[in-house]
Structure formats: C-alpha cells, structure tokens
Amino acid sequence: MTTVAEAELEAANEIAPTKPPKLNTAAFKAVPETRALRDQVRAAVEAFCKTIDKSKPLTRDISREMSEQILASLGLGGQYLGFTMVMLTNEFWREQVAAIPFNRRLMLLPHCLKNAEGCPAEYDEFGLDCKKCGACEVGDFRTKAEQLGYKVLVSEGTPIVLKIIVSGHIDAIVGVACLNVLEKAFDKVLLAGIPCIATPLLSSNCKNTSVDNDWVFESIDLHTPPAGQKTKTYMHLMRAANAMFDEPELSRLVPRARAASPETDPLRKHEAIAYDFLARGGKRSRPFITLAAFDALKGAPATLSDSGWELSDSVKRAALAIETFHKASLVHDDIEDDDSYRYGEETLHRVHGVGTAINVGDYLIGLGYRLVSRDRKELGSDVAADILDKLADSHMKLSEGQGAELLWRDAPNKALTTLDALKIYALKTSPAFEAALYSGVRLAGSVEKYEKMIADFSRNVGVAFQILNDIKDWTGDHDNKLVAGQDVCAARPTLLLALALEGSSPAQREELLHLISTARTEGTDAEELVGRVRALYFSAKVFEKADKLVDKFRAKAESLADEVEPTEFREFLYYLVDTVLEKGELPRQAITQFVQLGM
C-alpha cells in the first residue's frame, strides 16, 4: 500500500483548514406564540423578498443570514429563526409554485395532525391512508387538494418524496410539517431545486398538533400565470439521467443484441440479467455529473427550463457508460465481500451463482467501453479516445484500490494507518467522480485547463464521500437491509478503524486488532463483535475525528472550485459538493441495532 502516486499522498496531507462548526439549531425552532406575531413576521418577509434576486438558488446559509436581518429589523429574538427561514423560503418560491398546474403538485401532510385517539386510518407503504372521516384537518386538506388535482401523501419521509420528484411526476411541493421535520428536509429540497411552500405546525409534539388552517388552504389554492423569473435547478438534468435507465429508453439508447432470440436462449437470459442490474437501484449520480458538467460548459440551459434544450444520444451514452462501469464494480465487489444484498434485493451471485455474476460484471465492463467507442464518429475520434483513456485509467485505479483492500483483509497483520486508509479511498472511490466529471467536460470541448482541477477536486470529494459512507455504516441502512457495523463484520480497512488504532491505548489497540482478525471467522458472534468495536470507537472518538476530516476535504474541494470559470461550471461544482457530501447524524453510543431484514 505504499506504491500509490505522490499526488494522492500529498492530497491526504495537504488539507484546508476546518470550517466553523454548523450552528446548533435546537434553540431556534420556536413558533411565534400569537397569530398577530406570526402575521407580523410573514409580512416583514414578504416585503424583504421583493428586493432579492430569485434566479439564484436559495441555500440554508443565505436563508439564515436574510432571516437574521429580518428578525433584527423587527426587534425579535433568535428563537424564531427557524420559523422565519420557512417563511422566507415560502416567499422565495411562492410565485413559481403558483404558476405550476395543480396536477403537477404534491401535497405533503403530517400524520401528527390526526386525532390520535379516534383515527381509523391505517399506514401503507406511502404513509397514512386517510379515511376522510372529518375528525381532524388532514381529511379537509386532503379533500381540497385532491379536488384541485394534487397528488397527496400523509407522510414525513423525505426519501420517498425525493424519489417522486426525480421520477418527474411532480414539479412543486405544498406541505405542512413541524419545524423539526422541516429542518431535516430543508437542505434536500433546496438542493433539488423544487419549488415548495410549507406551513409550520404550531408545535412539535408529534400528537394532536394544530396549524393555521387558513394559511394551509391559501397555499393549496395558489394559482397565477407563469412566473416571470425562474430559479436555476438541476432537477431537469437529474430527471434526464434517471430516465435513461427506464424502458423503453434504455433499450433504445443501448439496443439489446439478443432481443430477437427465444426467451429460453441462454444468451438472451444473460443479456437480460445484465440489463436488469444496470437499470436497478442507485441514485444515478455519476451519469448526472457527466450530463450536468456538459450542460454547465454549454451555458447551463437545462438549469432554467425543461424544454428548449436537448442532449444528443451520444452524450447520453457516454453518461451511461460511467454508470455501467460502476454497476460492474458493484457486482464484483459483492462477490469479493460475499455481500447478501444490493439495492434491497439479493446480490447477483446469491441469485445466479458466482460464475454467472462474474461474467455479468465483465459483460458490463465491455458494454461501457463500447458505448463510447461506437459513437466516435458523432463525438469525434479524439474526444472518444480521451474519454476511453480516462475510463481505463479510472478502472485500473479502482482495481488497485480494491486489490489493496482485499490483500489487507486476507493478511494476518491488521495494522492500518490513516494514511493507508486514505490512499485506498483515493483509489477506490475518487476515480468514479473523476471519470464522470472529466467525460462531461470533454464532451463539451477542450479539457486541458480543467484536467488537474478535476483530478484534485474529485480526489477530495471522493475521499470525503467514502468517509461519510464509513460513518453511515454505523447507523445501518434499511433500504439495503443492512445492520450497523457491516464494515467490521467484513473486516474492511476503513478510516474509522485506522483512527481507532492510532487513538487507543495499547490494551485497546491489541483488543481491536484481535476483534478485526477474527471478524470473518466462522462462529463469531456478529452482534457482540459490533458492540465491542463500537465501544472502542467511541472511546477513541473516531466518529468526531472522521467528521472533522470530512469538513477538511470538503473545504479543500470548495477552494479548488473557487478558482473555476465559467460561473455555471463553478456553481455546479459547489452544488456537487453540497449534494455528494451531505451529512447525516453521527452514530450514537447507545442505539437499538437494526434487525436484519429478510433473513
């Protein structure tokens, strides 16, 4: 693990200063006690918003700064900051929400408005199935919204809402929620660039709560001619990236060579397995990066409209190639780690056998190269050659990183330094970001002046992203049917392990090395193993240390983006940092372990 390029070694050592810690918002979530005071804050926000430029996306930091100004002008305390930020966001988007047809809007209602003692409704996969019995406001709001053509969900789950947004079924959200829920959803909705209006609940009790009903009905009824000023959003490009994997579009872009063969033909079956896995699951972030980088260097027309711009099939196929390589690596990784689930379903090798799964991964690699090489006439031979070279380089780095991880896992000596872990991350995770970003830039024109920046930026983003994944591993993952601590059970060389080894006492270090060395031994009690390692990690404060490293790598990536021109490309790089490096809560010392689903 000492033969990695000097650039990666320097990147691990040269880290920008840590940003100031994020504001603790617990003391800023009070709702003004009287309706008169709520109306006063809203009126001040409306007046303030008449002066701001709504073509630029609103961020949490900008919203907080503006809200603090408004509260200061009213002589009110900071306890109303969260409420004021919601009012500001509402006013920012109000005109654009009003211009969107009712049948393209989603009404999102909280279950805590229901009458807890007598509610006859039951829960399904989408939330509370309201019976409209008249015992609470939920039915009234739902009836009104559905009469106008809204899609309605009684749920507070952000993931399902984001899936609906990306799928292209809605263009705006009108919601009701407490300030705690709105805070959690704030960054996701703003980053998605989806017009939204939310009416805050008057308390966060999560039971028999109340709301300003007339404000809710007002937001449901909003309807005006198309807005004169639109805010930039990457939603159109997210949807374009997502749509490439839906049928019949996937088979149109990448025709199935064996489609005419009988269904019983093994060649057709093998092709179907590969296409099914290519289309399955994932956020499609890598092809999105390629499309968005290409668009940014073409003036970013797709960020202002879902019409008037078009991506050629050759550009789409190049973006598809990035995801094809990613999916191939997942198939092979799952075999090497003997993982049970991927995207909430059994892994390919568990369903079809190791041999078939290996071959499907190889098939996807070949398909990825062919997607670019077959379009060299449309792209230009030099463009195709440059992209193929970058894909090959990324493929080799990924294999080096995975190889180093496997050799460490199977070696008797489990010593690991933070530098060792960071070098593996720079090889395993960063190349995918680099290939996606490079391809988009090269499709748009010359890449020469961006090449070093792309490599450095991708390295910092990729390493930070992998550290966040390490942290997330300790909170579990319901979507992929994983319990917390899977990296320990698989004896992976993570940064968290390296930090623990370096920050523990000799006795703790010896115990940790023993635990990792026996993690994959038959008969090991996984729950006991994870519990003991968790305790050692907390003793060494590894989660806090890892979180600070994420901040440092993020700051370095942002400093690289600061120097980039044109503005559209620089703004996309900032957006990429915000979305890829979105943080969750740090693991808690005492949590209830997730139950392994489907076992």
Regions found by a protein language model. Give the residues of each.
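Mobile late-domain/C-terminal helix-loop "cap" segments
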Residues: 510-564
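Conserved mixed alpha/beta catalytic, RNA-binding, or beta-rich assembly cores of soluble enzyme
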Residues: 62-171, 176
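Short, structured coil segments at secondary-structure junctions
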Residues: 148, 191-194
